[in-house]
Amino acid sequence: MARVKRGVVARARHKKVLKLANGYYGARSRVYRVAFQAVLKAGQYCYRDRRCKKRQFRKLWITRINAAVRQHGITYSCFMNSLKKASIHIDRKILAEIAISDKVAFATLAEKAKSILCVT
């Protein structure tokens, strides 16, 4: 049997992990064992937060729409219900953008929603 020397492979693997851990604090960026654990944990956080980001943005859009709609004297739920009844299909992302950038257009949407206002 020929002797198998794995130094090159191990060094390459270690370098790859340490490169991923570049910028981490202390031993996490220098010691392979600690860096490997840090990189694994970072990957878990990354996976989780890619899904969480979608929820966070939806919350942000709803908050922005709610704030803009209340200036016109309507609640968020009433506004969304009225838009649905009026067959105006604009998603929350675009509504939030309109609320910030184009106040006149948003005011017309709010007035349209007020005319079909839900009964509470």
UniProtKB/Swiss-Prot annotation:
GO cellular component, one term: ribonucleoprotein complex
Keywords for this protein: Ribonucleoprotein, Ribosomal protein, RNA-binding, rRNA-binding
Recorded superkingdom: Bacteria
Keyword RNA-binding part of the UniProt annotation: yes
InterPro entries: Ribosomal_bL20, RIBOSOMAL_L20_CS, Ribosomal_protein_bL20_C
UniProt GO BP: ribosomal large subunit assembly; translation
CDD domains: Ribosomal_L20 (cd07026)
Keyword Kinase listed: no
GO MF term (any one): structural constituent of ribosome
Signal peptide: none
PANTHER family membership: 39S RIBOSOMAL PROTEIN L20
HAMAP family named in the record: Ribosomal_bL20 (MF_00382)
Membership in a protein family: Belongs to the bacterial ribosomal protein bL20 family.
Name the record gives this protein: Large ribosomal subunit protein bL20
Organism, as annotated: Baumannia cicadellinicola subsp. Homalodisca coagulata
Source lineage: Bacteria, Pseudomonadati, Pseudomonadota, Gammaproteobacteria, Candidatus Palibaumannia
Gene that this sequence comes from: rplT
